[in-house]
Amino acid sequence: MLSVNELALDIFEELFEYAEELHAVPHELDNGARIVDCGVSTSGGYLTGRRFTEICMGGLGEVDISMGKIRDFPIPFIEVSTDFPSIACLGAQKAGWTVNVNKYFAMGSGPARALSLKPKHTYEVIEYEDEFDYAVICLESDHLPNAAVMENIAEACNVDVANTCAVVAPTASLVGSIQVAGRCVETAVYKLNELGFDTKKITAGIGHAPIAPVKKDGTKAMGSTNDATIYHGSIMLTMNAPEIKDYLDKIPSNKSKGYGKPFYDIFKEANFDFYQIDTSLFSPAEVVINELSEGKVYHVGAVNPEVTLKSFGFI
């Protein structure tokens, strides 16, 4: 069986070795754990963001960045594709691990989750778990983890702490903007999973989303990076599942009652309480489904340039 940690480790090793050329900073802790700072105390960059995203997808995704436009405004776009959508997106990329050790907090994603099985239900549904002696984790945080944090991760993954590897970037950083936009396909797969659809029937996924300009404030950065997919993420999924027609109307973000405002404004109105936000908002703007058994194509949703540009600060 494919090992997402083994595949991601190869990318991590390259990032660690060539960190200086990538505006990243490598660290090896006293306990042997290795960390690459991709934006906490350094600038990071587009190539670093690509590598971060590839690691987050467990080495099962292809990532490209190119310039595009939203109306008359030039903006970089990330394009992500995978031929293993269920494993790459839910088994690795999903931010399903809250790392909270002493005073350290981070949202954890990446292939290490497939060792720790966080959350376990996800791996039961996709019928996948990894077996490998290295754990590779992606941490969305303003701070680097210390030895105690890495030991906690190692214990959860049942590996030696010297075999733990972490890439770290704040939301309010270039790599942060890139890797969140790089979750555009994941949001579609995640949404279908939440609706009860068997995501193992999805055979391929591709999508693109604009990379949000970096905000100084972390909460505002969280808003604009999420808006990249909510209001301008375009996804195509290939599958063998004629029953998908029963799910179409519930997939895109414009079906959410919170739709129509920048995420930061919605979050502020909810007194910055996630539990008051309609979770169906966390979906791509538009999705195309190519259903193979009946040879049909479905299209739902639409991009919203107005809200995207407002969120990004262009208008």
UniProtKB/Swiss-Prot annotation:
It holds the Pfam family MCH. The keyword Hydrolase applies. It is found in: Cytoplasm. Pathway: One-carbon metabolism; methanogenesis from CO(2); 5,10-methenyl-5,6,7,8-tetrahydromethanopterin from CO(2): step 3/3. The keyword Cytoplasm applies. InterPro entries: METHMP_CycHdrlase. It catalyses: 5,10-methenyl-5,6,7,8-tetrahydromethanopterin + H2O = N(5)-formyl-5,6,7,8-tetrahydromethanopterin + H(+). Its EC number is 3.5.4.27. Keywords: Cytoplasm, Hydrolase, Methanogenesis, One-carbon metabolism. CDD domains: MCH. One of its GO terms (cellular component) is cytoplasm. One of its GO terms (molecular function) is methenyltetrahydromethanopterin cyclohydrolase activity. One of its GO terms (biological process) is methanogenesis, from carbon dioxide. Gene3D superfamilies: Methenyltetrahydromethanopterin Cyclohydrolase, Chain A, domain 1, Methenyltetrahydromethanopterin Cyclohydrolase, Chain A, domain 2. Belongs to the MCH family. Catalyzes the reversible interconversion of 5-formyl-H(4)MPT to methenyl-H(4)MPT(+). This is Methenyltetrahydromethanopterin cyclohydrolase. It comes from Methanoculleus marisnigri (strain ATCC 35101 / DSM 1498 / JR1). The gene is mch.
